[in-house]
Amino acid sequence: MTIFFSVEILVLGIAEFAAIAMDAAQQGDTTTILMLPWLGYGHLSAFLELAKSLSRRNFHIYFCSTSVNLDAIKPKLPSSFSDSIQFVELHLPSSPEFPPHLHTTNGLPPTLMPALHQAFSMAAQHFESILQTLAPHLLIYDSLQPWAPRVASSLKIPAINFNTTGVFVISQGLHPIHYPHSKFPFSEFVLHNHWKAMYSTADGASTERTRKRGEAFLYCLHASCSVILINSFRELEGKYMDYLSVLLNKKVVPVGPLVYEPNQDGEDEGYSSIKNWLDKKEPSSTVFVSFGSEYFPSKEEMEEIAHGLEASEVNFIWVVRFPQGDNTSGIEDALPKGFLERAGERGMVVKGWAPQAKILKHWSTGGFVSHCGWNSVMESMMFGVPIIGVPMHVDQPFNAGLVEEAGVGVEAKRDPDGKIQRDEVAKLIKEVVVEKTREDVRKKAREMSEILRSKGEEKFDEMVAEISLLLKI
């Protein structure tokens, strides 16, 4: 699909510029940081948690994203941050086929993802105007916008890359670029055969898109000022952090896990009914099922997962999502006939959205059937919930392997054709949530949670020291 954008929308209004400029002038001697995440929810969430931590250290934060994304994350920002974190709207070019409410990956139909990347890159001119107006002391940017550090460099503004993915997948991807004739030094990690085949047989168009995004990702890493921030922690990826530091000749500073800490009694749309249902279950007896905001399982995948849940005989909450604009799909049509009736009180199916962190933190949740998106992996580890990994694409197979290596979860193996197997899903759910065979996984997940919760705000000390050194403050 080809979408034509008008560049006129990139022009920032005089009134808006004046308001931002006045705010910048009022900051005086305060060190200001502009943060620019990619448009995916996992990226936004991690950046927002980092913004909170920086503001607690007396930095003033400008948080820049599209209006639809800013509206989505504002409820997660307590009023105590209203003076230290300011939202700044980034205008993407739009068109009748690509209006502003689609300027996010959340629920975006996969066919429109290339258009979103194109529109984001075309926002560079507007972003330059924002940088010129605010004149922040530092830019912290994500990994899919090489134009951001270029613009910052032209304005003599130092920039640091904050990577919201895991370190293993980055170091594994960079290794053949630096050492094309040698094996990755950590040979104990092996992808399942299905994923090896999938990554080696991508079609030409996918390969070209992947190549371009890989180049952008690589540029963002190398453009960072002597330091790379990573949403991870040494207990999980220490050896990969050390190796990435060697590959990039930059200091890799962990700041993770960056996880939204929910208040179980807080107001979230639809949570009261979920909480009431969870409260009736036994401790650690329920499995939470979700595949993130950007992947929509096929009907065949939905059926295999449903049959697996049914055969496991374990309580479950399953979040089912459909792309924006899909008004033809209903839960009943997507699931096997009679599934909801047979599940009865043992299962709850939620359409669209559910407060994942609150569900994972609830005492009756004992397992997480997850696509292994990095944000979900971090949340699961923070709350001590073991993972049953059902990765779908991009970095998720690598994350699932890392989860297995850490001992806090297991990956569901696919059949020789790469399809999800209902029997495998059922078996792993029972083992992880109920049976003694995976008690070691449950124990390791609890231990990991205790380690992470003991860190507190001290995990940001190294980051603050590096920023202070860079800015000479």
Swiss-Prot record:
Pathway: Secondary metabolite biosynthesis; terpenoid biosynthesis. One of its GO terms (molecular function) is UDP-glycosyltransferase activity. It holds the Pfam family UDPGT. Keywords: Transferase. C.sativus and L.esculentum expressing S.grosvenorii genes SgSQE1, SgCS, SgEPH2, SgP450, SgUGT269-1 and SgUGT289-3 accumulate siamenoside I and mogrosides III and V, thus providing a strategy for vegetable flavor improvement or for heterologous biosynthesis of mogrosides. CDD domains: GT1_Gtf-like. Gene3D superfamilies: Glycogen Phosphorylase B. One of its GO terms (biological process) is carbohydrate derivative biosynthetic process. The active site is at H43 (proton acceptor), D142 (charge relay). Highly expressed in mature fruits. This is Mogroside IIIx synthase.
